Amino acid sequence: YKRQGYDILFFWVARMMLFGLFAMDGKQPFHTIALHGLVRDQFGKKMSKSRGNTIDPIEFMDKYGTDALRFTLARGANPGKDQALAEDWVGGSRNFATKLWNATRFAMMNGATIQGELPATASLNGIDKWILSRLSETISEVDSLLESYEFARACDRIYHFAWDDLCDWYLELSKESFA
């Protein structure tokens, strides 16, 4: 498997494939090549030092966290399409990570554990059954999207399950049972 931006497809990837097939052992060096777009500035312009529109990923990671930058890039990774990158989008991903942290902390403070088996379905209330059903649907959709290299859609599905279904609905409705 090889991930590569389309800008050097013929200069690098094609050369490696031909070299492997004809100059080495006759085997193709990659079974899959996934082309991704280029990361551009927030206005869709190519990043360059002379324009002054480049970003320092280390700076973004220090300010927003590594996971926020990773999630932003993955969420914009549509196969073969360029993606614009704006600082406020990375900030939004940091807010998403914070939302997940707070939801987990809330659950742990109210007796959730990260080990063991789920209770029998018959003993669950309606809202618990609903969230487990939504989780199962989400896992199935995300697995399918990842298998077809649709990382942006997979991330979007994860985002909406976690933010909308889990945090906005399930946790809010479940708070009464902890009171």
Where on the chain are the PLM-derived regions?
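Conserved small/polar residues in nucleotide/adenosyl-binding loops
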Residues: 1
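A cross-family detector of function-defining hotspots
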Residues: 11
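C-terminal substrate/ligand-recognition segments
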Residues: 5-6
